[in-house]
Amino acid sequence: MAFKDNAVELEERVVAVNRVTKVVKGGRRLRFAALVVVGDHNGRVGFGTGKAQEVPEAIRKAVDDAKKNLIEVPMVGTTIPHEVLSEFGGAKVLLKPAVEGSGVAAGGAVRAVVELAGVADITSKSLGSNTPINIVRATVEGLKQLKRAEEIAALRGISVSDLA
């Protein structure tokens, strides 16, 4: 789900920059691939990739791509509503809600995504592959799976108090 109103300032964080080569008849063609996460620290986050012959241009393309792929993250206070395990490729990411004041217990790429989403208290574990792009994609997939208690109650046709 893309958001059109860019009135809110989005913070950008470069997660990875890779040097990639393409072997051609005359030798090797060098380019740079960038992975960037953007978020407003208020429940909106997105990631994007860009490739170019210069690093700044690759980052600019990645930022533009990330702004087109923003998602809304449901939150309960400063954490997520429930535990979620998501996979992408060989990467698995486990996201668990944490009590207020715990902080962000997450490494590398997962930390970038959840901090820019505005989640202040969360515990996470990355399992399997630790490739940054797959970790970011798995984290975003996990955040997409989250549902508030009100949404679950509405789907089941019961009141929120009957969920417990």
UniProtKB/Swiss-Prot annotation:
Provide an example Pfam family for this protein: Ribosomal_S5_C
> A GO biological process this protein is involved in?
translation
Has UniProt tagged this entry with the keyword Cell cycle? no
Entry keyword RNA-binding: yes
Per its UniProt entry, which superkingdom is the organism in? Bacteria
Mind telling me which InterPro entries this protein's record contains?
Answer: Ribosomal_Su5_D2-typ_SF (IPR020568), Ribosomal_uS5 (IPR000851), Ribosomal_uS5_bac-type (IPR005712), Ribosomal_uS5_C (IPR005324), Ribosomal_uS5_N (IPR013810), Ribosomal_uS5_N_CS (IPR018192), Ribsml_uS5_D2-typ_fold_subgr (IPR014721)
Q: Which GO terms describe its cellular component?
A: small ribosomal subunit
Any idea which UniProt keywords this protein has?
Ribonucleoprotein, Ribosomal protein, RNA-binding, rRNA-binding
Write out the GO MF terms.
rRNA binding; structural constituent of ribosome
Where does the record place the S5 DRBM domain?
A: 10-73
Q: Which family does it belong to?
A: Belongs to the universal ribosomal protein uS5 family.
- HAMAP family xrefs: Ribosomal_uS5_B (MF_01307_B)
What functional role does this protein have? Answer: With S4 and S12 plays an important role in translational accuracy.
Give the domain note: The N-terminal domain interacts with the head of the 30S subunit; the C-terminal domain interacts with the body and contacts protein S4. The interaction surface between S4 and S5 is involved in control of translational fidelity.
Q: Could you describe the subunit structure of this protein?
A: Part of the 30S ribosomal subunit. Contacts proteins S4 and S8.
Name the chain's protein: Small ribosomal subunit protein uS5
Q: Which gene encodes it?
A: rpsE
